[in-house]
């Protein structure tokens, strides 16, 4: 039986500001990435999100990003590899403390937004992320963009297990990278098209690029976005579609 992980970014609320549909989406995913306070989230939200995830028996990962609350961590920053190492170490360590305090065990680290995209094409950034993970806990998994040589090489260097990730509602360029969110066609807004793309990636191992060419994608985890108007409906559709197609949903080991 084919097995796939469904992951979602949660814990993105901040103080009085609510983001996402965390409670409603948790039943349909197998792992979550928790914002750690730099691009979103705060200590109370981190604790609450961890506790809810443990109640649902969902795997927990840190979602470190750039220190850019206003830009939600989606803007590139001119930072050194040393700074990236510090950012990841700081945020991941903070979430790990909350997970341990709640009696759980953290499973993975997935960089957020611009940090993720920069790491996918910048070996120095990817190296700094993998190095931080190695120094915190070498058994932590690294979630990174499928086919990214930067992620692959960094994971191999530090002997960190890489979980290659694909996106349900994002379009892909010919080189296998994601279409930038600054482009109008970055997101797939038609649910049926997104479902078709996900099944194609999981069952057949490829995705159609924006140019119409087939791009090989061997994904072990699929990212769902939890902050859209129909995010919960979409998550439930993917969950049920996988079940109907004999695809088992399970966090990576």
UniProtKB/Swiss-Prot annotation:
Signal peptide: none annotated. The keyword Nucleotide-binding applies. It holds the Pfam family LamB_YcsF. It comes from the Bacteria. It is an enzyme of class 3 (hydrolase). Forms a complex composed of PxpA, PxpB and PxpC. This is 5-oxoprolinase subunit A. It comes from Bacillus cereus (strain ATCC 14579 / DSM 31 / CCUG 7414 / JCM 2152 / NBRC 15305 / NCIMB 9373 / NCTC 2599 / NRRL B-3711). The gene is pxpA.
């Amino acid at each position: 039986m084919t097995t796939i992980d469904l992951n979602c970014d949660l814990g993105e609320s901040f103080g009085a500001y609510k983001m996402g549909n965390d409670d409603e989406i948790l039943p349909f995913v197998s792992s979550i990435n928790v914002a750690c306070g730099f691009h979103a989230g705060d200590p109370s939200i981190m604790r609450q999100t961890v506790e809810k995830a443990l109640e649902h028996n969902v795997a927990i990962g840190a979602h470190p990003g750039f220190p850019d609350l206003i830009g939600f961590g989606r803007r590139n920053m001119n930072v050194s590899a040393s700074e990236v190492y510090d950012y990841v170490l700081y945020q991941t360590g903070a979430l790990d403390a909350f997970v341990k305090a709640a009696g759980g065990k953290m499973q993975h680290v997935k960089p957020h937004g611009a940090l993720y995209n920069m790491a996918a094409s910048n070996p120095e950034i990817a190296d700094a992320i993998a190095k931080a993970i190695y120094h915190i806990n070498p058994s932590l998994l690294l979630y990174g963009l499928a086919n990214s040589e930067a992620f692959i090489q960094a994971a191999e260097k530090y002997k960190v297990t890489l979980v290659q990730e694909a996106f349900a509602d994002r379009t892909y360029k010919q080189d296998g990278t994601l279409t930038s969110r600054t482009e109008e066609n970055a997101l797939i807004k038609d649910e049926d098209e997104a479902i078709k793309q996900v099944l194609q990636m999981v069952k057949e191992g490829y995705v159609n690029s924006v140019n119409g060419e087939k791009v090989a994608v061997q994904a072990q985890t699929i990212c769902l976005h939890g902050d859209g108007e129909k995010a919960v409906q979409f998550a439930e559709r993917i969950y049920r579609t996988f079940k109907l197609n004999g695809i088992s949903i399970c966090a990576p080991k």
